[in-house]
Every structure is written in structure tokens, then in C-alpha cells.
A protein has these predicted regions:
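N-terminal coiled-coil initiation/transition segments in long coiled-coil scaffolds
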Residues: 15-21
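Short, positively charged interaction helices/loops
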Residues: 55-91, 95-98, 102, 124-167
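Σ70-family region 2.3-2.4 aromatic/basic alpha-helix that recognizes the −10 promoter
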Residues: 19, 47-48, 89
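Arg/Lys-rich, low-complexity, intrinsically disordered N-terminal tails that contact nucleic acids
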Residues: 1-13
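Short glycine-enriched loop/turn motifs at secondary-structure junctions
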Residues: 11-15, 81-84
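The DNA-recognition helices of helix-turn-helix-type DNA-binding domains
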Residues: 37, 52-53, 57, 121-122
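Surface-exposed, Lys/Arg-rich phosphate-binding patches that contact polyanionic backbones
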Residues: 9-10, 23-44, 48, 94-113, ...
Length: 167
């Protein structure tokens, strides 16, 4: 009998797979961002994005629910009539999967649309604010920022650049 119990535990998964249907522009944008960030894996980029956006919205591990939105979530992708052409899957941990579900419900979006919108917004923030202070060299940081700058985003995901600090 103990063998059956051990076997049941071994079959449990610590992750969930999320399938996304992307427009070619979204797919290209995600590829460019991953390449700019020293070939970061797409799943990692998207997990960072959804965690950051969920926290920004107040969706986090707490007993208090997030305050209701006072306006429409601005990062919901505007798809129009153009059909999606690219299907991708990402793998997320169980806690991240739960955060995605809670955040998507909070903004009244499907989980895939929340993931896509949060990731596009994250790329916009990286373009505007990423400094590369942990890059191996100043040249590498400059290359990463330049590659991020070349990414074209729809207007709703563009952020004003922060000015340089004056000393």
C-alpha cells in the first residue's frame, strides 16, 4: 500500500501549461525582447511580467482582496478582426498560475489576454526604465538597452522615458 501512495505523489505536477494564441506582431515583440535580454526564455519573461503586473494591481498573497479597478485595465490587447497565427505554450509554477487566474479575474480578462497584455506592458516598462546595472560590462548594458529601444510597441504599452539623474 505505501507504494501506491508514493506513486500518487510522484504523479503530481508542480506546474501548469498555459497555451496562448498570438498575433505575429505580439510573437515578434516577445522574441525581440527575449533576444535583447541575452536570450531570456519566453516563459521567464512572461512570468516576470505577470507577477509584476499582478503586484501593481494589488493582486498578491494577502487575505485582503485587491481594491476594485476604477477604470478599464489599459493593457488588454486590442486584437480587432485579425486572426491569431502563432500558438505557444508556457509553463508556470502552481503559485504563478494561481496569481494569473486571480489577476485575470480582477481585470475581467481571459488568462491568455492577461498574460499577453502584462508582458507587452512589461516590455514597455523595460524599454523606458531598464538600466542594465547587473550586466557584465557597460557595453553589454548599452547593447541590451539599444535592442530594447528597437522594439516597436503599440501606443498603450509605451512609457515616457525617465530622465537621467542629475548629480
Amino acid at each position: 500500500m505505501p507504494v501506491a501512495k508514493v506513486q500518487a505523489v510522484e504523479n503530481r505536477k508542480s506546474f501548469r501549461t498555459k497555451t496562448l494564441r498570438l498575433h505575429p506582431l505580439e510573437n515578434r515583440t516577445f522574441d525581440q525582447a527575449c533576444e535583447a535580454l541575452n536570450d531570456m526564455e519566453r516563459t521567464q519573461l512572461m512570468q516576470e511580467a505577470v507577477i509584476q503586473e499582478a503586484a501593481r494591481l494589488g493582486v498578491r498573497w494577502t487575505v485582503e482582496p485587491a481594491a476594485p479597478l476604477t477604470s478599464v485595465w489599459p493593457y488588454l490587447p486590442q486584437r480587432g478582426d485579425e486572426p491569431t497565427q502563432v500558438r505557444v505554450s508556457i509553463t508556470v509554477s502552481l503559485p504563478v498560475a494561481e496569481i494569473i487566474t486571480r489577476a485575470a479575474e480582477h481585470v475581467h480578462a481571459s488568462e491568455p489576454m492577461f498574460i499577453i497584455g502584462a508582458t507587452l506592458a512589461h516590455i514597455g516598462r523595460l524599454k523606458a526604465c531598464f538600466k542594465g546595472i547587473h550586466a557584465d560590462t557597460p557595453e553589454e548594458a548599452r547593447d541590451i538597452r539599444a535592442a530594447l529601444d528597437r522594439i516597436k510597441l503599440p501606443p498603450q504599452y509605451q512609457y515616457p522615458r525617465r530622465g537621467r539623474r542629475r548629480r
